[in-house]
A protein has these predicted regions:
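C-terminal regulatory/oligomerization modules of transcriptional regulators
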Residues: 1-7, 85-110
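A short, Lys/Arg-enriched interface patch at domain edges and termini
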Residues: 58-92
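Short alpha-helical scaffold segments that flank and stabilize functional sites
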Residues: 23-24, 36, 66, 79-80, ...
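Residue-identity detector for glycine
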Residues: 25, 38, 47, 71, ...
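Basic helix-turn-helix/winged-helix DNA-binding cores
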Residues: 1-63
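A periodicity- and composition-biased signal for non-globular, repetitive helical segments
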Residues: 38, 50, 56, 65-67, ...
Length: 110
């Protein structure tokens, strides 16, 4: 089930590590090691409990697919995840630039 099918906002941290581990079929220690190397960054409560959002869970699922299905090592996963994020940011900037261009074109035609 995807995070966008839930009434909880995708970025809201609500799931404890034990729940996340069961949801995606990973050992809690594996999730902790992914956190240590920066592949996922869960929210921490005042009591230092990890809370994961739907976005975090999707990220962990992506990491799991890359490692288990494609045989990518963790350093490679990190590079892929960073590049994917950069591409998403560039796509957003491109969309914004195109919208601004279209506004300018629309304004000069009148």
């Amino acid at each position: 089930m995807r995070y966008d099918e839930h009434p909880i906002p995708p970025h809201e941290p609500v799931f404890q590590i034990s729940i996340v581990a069961r949801m995606i079929g990973l050992h809690q220690q594996t999730i902790r090691s992914y956190e240590r190397i920066g592949l996922v960054t869960p929210h921490r409560t005042a009591g230092n409990t990890r809370l994961f959002s739907h976005e975090d869970i999707e990220r962990l699922r992506t990491v799991t697919r890359l490692v288990n299905d494609l045989g990518v090592n963790l350093a490679g996963v990190d590079v892929i995840m960073r590049m994917t994020h950069q591409i998403e940011q560039l796509q957003k900037e491109l969309e914004q630039t195109r919208a601004e261009r279209d506004q300018l074109r629309g304004g000069t035609r009148h």
